[in-house]
């Protein structure tokens, strides 16, 4: 790799990547799981001893005796401390001879469900929410706060906004239905330069029973763009739904996200056939993350049609925290008016991955009240109590009224920030929650009923 940027030169560099695939049943998480378990060190002073320790650890893991593990970098103290954070299970050291603060690259600390004799036992998990190393002890809460504070000034994790806001609920079950049924509805997935969620989106739609097709938008030359417009307009004529996936279309430039997508959909031919899909053929549209940004800029949410926007329209802007956020959040269903949410109930809580720098929903109070009354506020970010919140730990972008997703007036166009397509077996095993809100299955059923 080499190159330059302005006055900065990058010397020729070799970068190596390595992966170690394993069966999903062998996957371990780092959080301590239960009180009364022995905690062991698998390490060696020579390469041969280290390899033997790894083999012994692997054998125990495959036998189901390892319930959590940590690859040591900066010492045993760091390992047991961070292992304790997830479930606030304490640790008491039993081996004080070890150097708890010396780097130990290659070593593994593991929580075992059974006793073993061929590894070094270093301690035991405890009910007390503290880490005890001999006579020294500190609470997990204190240690976690100190750990978070190290880079808080550089990479803040909190903002001043906190507390609850109104949790909207709209109980109507009235939904639109298509005049023509489809056993296997076709879903068109436009892929723009910078889109990066098309494969997850296609997989989710296909598994739900849709005929999901990616459409690559080419923009290398003006002729490529014209050809893409013509072919996309033709493809829309035979589609039942359009799903705009997430990513960073056009690198989120110039000056904001989704402008490339917006310009493409405002083309007269594309606009005509998208309008026909929605207004004449009862079709559906979904925009996730970057796709949601495009739907808002086009007016498709909350107004249900492509239109010229002005300063009174809602928008999605930069996260309050001032940086990109990537994490799992909880969302609360506020309305089931949309066919996309037919598999949910008002008040249901779903955990969803988010990854964006511009996800803060802003709208006037008057518009929000109108959307709430119409049942167009589909989902809100929620805290552990199940209610909407402005706390940055749960509302990652500072969206007004904690709004995560909204719909068109009839619910057939849905935009949301959370990546509901990024779910599947063996994912997020260390974060409890309900992940599948049946978004794509509900869309397919809409055309079958």
Regions found by a protein language model. Name each.
Residues 2-104, 113-186, 194, 203:
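Intein/HINT protein-splicing elements and their conserved insertion hotspots or analogous self-processing inserts
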Residues 3-7, 27-31, 98-99, 176-179, ...:
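A generic local secondary-structure boundary/capping motif
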Residues 52-54, 269-270, 307-319, 324, ...:
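Active-site glycine-rich loop that binds ribose-phosphate moieties when present
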Residues 68, 94-104, 111-113, 220, ...:
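Hydrophobic alpha-helical bundle architecture
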Residues 68-82, 194-198, 248, 257, ...:
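Conserved phosphate/anionic-ligand binding catalytic regions in large, soluble enzymes, centered on
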Residues 134-288, 292-303, 308, 317-325, ...:
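N-terminal beta1-alpha1 cap of cysteine-dependent amidohydrolase-like domains
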Residues 328, 333-449:
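C-terminal and late-domain segments of enzyme folds
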């Amino acid at each position: 790799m080499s190159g330059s940027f302005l006055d900065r030169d990058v010397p020729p560099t070799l970068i190596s990547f390595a992966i170690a695939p394993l069966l999903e049943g062998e996957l371990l998480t780092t959080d301590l799981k239960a009180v009364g378990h022995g905690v062991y060190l698998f390490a060696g002073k020579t390469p041969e001893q280290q390899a033997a320790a790894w083999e012994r650890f692997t054998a125990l893991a495959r036998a189901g005796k390892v319930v959590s593990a940590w690859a040591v970098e900066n010492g045993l103290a760091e390992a047991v401390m961070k292992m304790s954070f997830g479930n606030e299970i304490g640790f008491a050291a039993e081996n004080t001879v070890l150097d708890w603060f010396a780097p130990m690259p290659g070593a593994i600390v593991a929580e075992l469900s059974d006793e073993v004799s061929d590894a070094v036992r270093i301690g035991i998990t405890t009910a007390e929410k503290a880490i005890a190393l001999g006579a020294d002890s500190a609470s997990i809460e204190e240690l976690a706060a100190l750990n978070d504070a190290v880079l808080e000034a550089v990479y803040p994790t909190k903002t001043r906004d906190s507390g609850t806001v109104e949790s909207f609920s709209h109980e109507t079950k009235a939904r639109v239905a298509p005049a023509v049924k489809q056993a296997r509805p076709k879903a068109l997935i436009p892929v723009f330069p910078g889109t990066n969620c098309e494969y997850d989106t296609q997989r989710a739609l296909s598994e739900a029973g849709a005929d999901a097709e990616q459409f690559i938008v080419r923009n290398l030359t003006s002729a490529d763009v014209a050809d893409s417009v013509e072919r996309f307009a033709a493809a829309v004529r035979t589609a039942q739904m359009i799903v705009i996936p997430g990513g960073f279309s056009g690198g989120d430039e110039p000056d904001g996200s989704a402008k490339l997508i917006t310009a493409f959909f405002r083309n007269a031919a594309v606009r005509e056939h998208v309008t026909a899909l929605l207004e004449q053929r009862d079709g559906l549209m979904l925009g996730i993350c970057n796709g949601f940004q495009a739907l808002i800029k086009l007016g498709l949410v909350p107004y249900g049609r492509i239109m010229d926007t002005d300063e009174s329209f809602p928008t999605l802007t930069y996260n309050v925290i001032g940086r990109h956020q990537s994490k799992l959040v909880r969302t609360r269903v506020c309305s089931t008016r949309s066919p996309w949410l037919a598999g949910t109930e008002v008040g249901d809580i779903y955990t969803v991955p988010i990854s964006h720098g511009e996800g803060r929903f802003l709208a006037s109070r008057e518009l929000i009240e109108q959307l709430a009354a119409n049942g167009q506020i589909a989902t809100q970010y929620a805290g552990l109590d199940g209610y909407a919140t402005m706390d940055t730990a749960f509302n990652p972008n500072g969206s007004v009224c904690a709004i995560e997703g909204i719909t068109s007036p009839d619910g057939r166009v849905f935009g949301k920030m959370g990546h509901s397509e990024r779910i599947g077996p063996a994912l997020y095993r260390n974060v409890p929650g309900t992940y599948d809100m049946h978004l794509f299955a509900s869309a397919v059923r809409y055309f079958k009923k």
